[in-house]
Amino acid sequence: MSQAFPHQPVMATEVVDLLAPVPPGLVVDATLGGAGHAAAILTAHPHLSVLGIDRDPSAVAAAAPELARFGERAVVRRARFDEVAGLVRRLQAETGVPVDQQGLSGALFDLGVSSPQLDVAGRGFSYRLDAPLDMRMDPTSGRTAADVVNEFDEDTLTALFVENGERRFARRIARAIIASRPHTATGELSEVVRAAIPAATRRTGGHPARRVFQAIRIAVNEELDQLDRALDDTLGLLRTGGRCVVISYHSGEDRLVKAKFVDASTGGCVCPPGLPCVCGASPEYRLVVRGSRRPSADEVDRNRRSEAARLRVIERIAAPVGHTANGEVA
């Protein structure tokens, strides 16, 4: 873990163990952060190298020196995780990886916002720290949280909040935000959200702005759209025996990951559950873990931010159509 980007990696032991059986080759850490997971993988598995990517320039700047001790086994790039396919192909072409070893032996997505992003007030992620409404993972590009809350209409804001768990008071909150525009700071917006919710309800369930800020952050960074594309590309890049591990922290992320993995592991089978498949589906993947894993009680005690984590993992068990098991075109 980088001291310049101090983020405790969640479920690192589980990640390392789950990647132990994969074939020698390249693992993508698609959410590099402080490089805690990447360093653990490289230390435990000499047969693996890591391409670490992150869109946050502060994470990249901190992770590169942290991984320098691993030499050519570690490569760091600043990019979004939905750019993974192009990055992998360029890296393997540049380094002369043989055709039968191209693709990914593994991939890791540790989703959501990191501790340094939450704890640095100026980033605007936290409802507890007053700061400009920003929330961009990459602070050099794209729309800000201020753009979202000041430009989205009532129906769009309401739908955004509902999709991210704030179902009961989503429209009341959207109306309150619109009525008190413009918004420029997290502290002021947090108070608007708090005041929109009945006092009796505010006494339970944590801070009323938590889910609203999460929803705004997801919209600012287009997290679900990018995750959807990234998972499709990553699953397609997996070699036979390769695994993709995803750690999610809220229901929207987890639903998307679960749906992708279930579809891949059934080969798109449309037959009724419990009956033999007659639709001709031919799965190329299997679920390594049925359902999801949660962090241990000890880990939650050490790191309260790990409490919401859900880990899912899938493995490629067959070569893609038109390729042999060693990756060559048939």
PLM segments and residue spans:
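S-adenosyl-L-methionine-dependent methyltransferase catalytic core, i.e., the SAM/SAH-binding region
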Residues: 1-330
